[in-house]
Amino acid sequence: MFKNKRIDKFAQNAIIMNLRDAIEESLRKRPFFEEALQEDLINISSLARLLQPEISTSMGKEVKESALVMAIRRREPRLQLKMQQKLQQFIAMLGDIVIRSNLAAYTYIKSAQLPAKQARFLETIESDHKAFYSFTGGTEETTIVLSEKYESLLKEVMNGETLLNAEYNLSAITLKLPSSSSEVVGLYYFFFKHIASAGVPIKEIISTTNEATFVVHSNDVNLAFTTINTIKRPV
C-alpha cells in the first residue's frame, strides 16, 4: 500500500508539472496578463476560466478551474518579470529625448536601380545637416523616412520605382541609449508595451547602436512623448 501511495504521489507531481508547463505556455502568449498577475491587477479565478479550454486541450483532458486557480497562485514569476526592476533602473539612465516633426515615410519595392537612386538623393541633401532621413531595407522593400520638405525631391529621384505605401504628417521620438543597451533583455518590449497601452500606433521603428527612434503620427506624438518620459522618470 505504501508503494502505491508513492506511485500516486509521483503521478500527481507529474500532472502538476504538466499543468504548470501548460499555464506557462498560455501566459507566454499573453505577456500583458503576466504583468497584471505580478501587480495583482487581474482576478485569478477569471483568468483560470479564460485559460481553462486552452489548457485542457493542451493536456488532453479536462482541467478543473479550482486546480488552475491553485496552480496559478503557486507559480513563480517568469524570468522577464524578475528582471523588471533592473530594466527600470536601466531606463532611468537613458539620455535625452529628441522630437522631430514634419516627416513622411515612403516604402518602395526593392529594385536593382534603387541603391543608386538612394545615393543620388543623399548627395543632394547632404549639405543640410538639419535634414532628417532614414533608409530601412527589408528583403523585398525599402522604407525611407524623411523631412517633408524633401518629398518632391524624393519623388523625382525615385521616378520609375514601385511605391507600396506612403505615410504623411509623422513625427519621430528618438531616445539616446547607453552603449550597453544591446545587452539588456526586454528593452524595446518595455517601450512597445507602454506605448501600446497608451493607444498609440507605431508607424516605423528606426534603430542604431546608441539610438532608438519611434515614428508615430503627429497627432499622437505628445501622448507618446509623455508616456516615454513618464516611464523614464516614474513618479
Describe each model-derived feature in a short phrase.
Residues 15-57:
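Long amphipathic alpha-helical segments
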Residues 3-16:
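Short, Lys/Arg-enriched N-terminal segments with co-localized hydrophobic residues
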Residues 18, 34, 38-44, 64-235:
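A conserved regulatory-domain signal marking ACT and ACT-like small-molecule sensing domains
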